[in-house]
Amino acid sequence: MKKDYAKKRYIGKIIVAFLFGAAIMAFIRYISYGGMNSGTQVNNEEFLKVAEEIDDIAIPKNVKIFALGEATHGNKEFQELKLDMFRKMVEEYNCKAFALEADYGGCLLVNQYIHGEGKNTEDDAVEALAFHIYQTDEMRALIRYMADYNKQAKPEEMLSFYGFDMQNSDLDQKCVDEAFSELKMQYTDMEDAAETLKNIPGMEMYAQAARCYLQNQELSNASNVDYAKIRDHYMAENIDWIYEHVQKGNESMLMISGHNGHVAKKSTYTTFMGEELFEKYGDDYFVIGTDFYKTECNLPGKNGKRITRKFYSADPLANTAHALGMDMTYLDFDKLQKSEKIKEIINKNMLMGSLGEGYSFLNKILPNSYRINDVPAELYDGMIIVKNATPTDIKN
């Protein structure tokens, strides 16, 4: 009897150990995929009917503002797309200006550099973007392309670089101070600076720097609840100003680039930038969002260090692109007549990846913290899907 009891006890321990090991393996699999697998797929043949190459992307001729979204801030491919798409807009759609989700003052210094003004170097221009996420070779390549283009262009054909964010006011103040130094004038406060500069010919861009400084002051005093709403409202207002400013020199399209969540035509819980722009410009505002099958994303860690973490979007379209071995593909939501099944999918809620400039271990165990569940056709006019998004290499 004692031997039988000991044997049963031994077997019981083995079973418990096996179940514990299986639970650990299941947990590891869950936090790796954000579920027990990377999600569902759509029919391969249906997907192939509508999938296009990036080079084949076309947008309507009436578009005034073209927006390129990014599913994360920490992937090389999404930054490379900024240059790829901007070059296409310049060469095929008479686009003369690019605006980035970055502080206005820093981008004004970049604009001076690409126009050959002042003593700033290419390194200075990249550094002026301030946000760590932009200290990359990919953003340097975009700035270099614009600077090289302008060296060969007539003054009225030159490209311009703008920022529509206002989270750092230091460079806004620097630009305003430089303007008043050049004018040999003084200002009492930033309201006075904005009012004075807007009435002086050639100083409109510096007046906008003063306005962005004031926006930052309001944003700094906002509650956590109101912060995102105020920021996105001002970003929409700034893009509207940039577009109108661009038209004064030479009527042309404006390309903007920011996170998917900012540029999307529909907001989730509050009115974001893209929704405001869509309400004003309607079909003249054209948005291409992005997503990934798998991302190894560069994210902020503790003590200012950068880390890389892996996530899966569970996007059925991205899963299909992965299964077909398509590194990067484009779906134009207005050209889905060849596949009613795909058209039906993008007009229903589906999971998509979404990572900002923040990370917590909870992201690994709470998939909804890095995914959205929304209707693609209500957010975008088309989507670029990246199979495997690789991390950016931040230089500073």
Model-derived regions: residue spans:
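Structured catalytic-domain cores with a bias toward divalent-metal coordination
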Residues: 8-396
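Juxtamembrane low-complexity tails/linkers enriched in Ser/Thr-Pro and polybasic
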Residues: 1-6
